């Protein structure tokens, strides 16, 4: 029997079982769970209609590797979806079938041999020197010492918002001519050490001098004293972006700013280590030449 949502009751139950398992086993936010459910529903809807199954009911044991390959091809050719959307849905399927194997619902994962589609990586927009100065000035003019220090730390270490929120005072080590901070909550919980330059050390020393000694977090919420949430951090950065009249930038662009500036003089493998990248491919986005760079290079050999 088909639900009003467009897929069978069996399909709906499949989604519910998977999402319930993720809810129990992993700490995922509601938005991520909703995306997983939507992606799986898209596949099941295609399976029960476009793939021409006689009884129109989804059964996981009926899904083979060629089935998923046909789905990938359909998303590319007839649906004309963007590579990023196709890959996100394929990754969801891979996660679903991996879970199904772990729960003994199937013996083999049919999605394993299926490759993702090529995706052209676009380098993030670069924040300029002028924009960085305007952002810092906006915080100095109307922000607290905590907010000013947060911006300096993010611009000079490239930390992710989650990593900034999780910092504790004990994660900071400052000497006379060097310093470092320890990131304990990076992606996949990988710990790493990030060096602190003179600007960062001076800002942190000034800020930590007035920070309550019993504070469990380096940058606690000014309202509650508890952990500053990532949402609150993004909001405060956006506030200063707006005050500085900067458009098209977000909190993550502070990390990109660090990556671009460092890439000019830092070997790729060292930059990847500092930024906590698992793959050098991720770090490569900071060394790809812009159109202006390429134009400048070819102009050098022009006949005058």
Residues covered by each model-derived region:
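Conserved catalytic core of the tyrosine transesterase superfamily
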Residues: 1-304
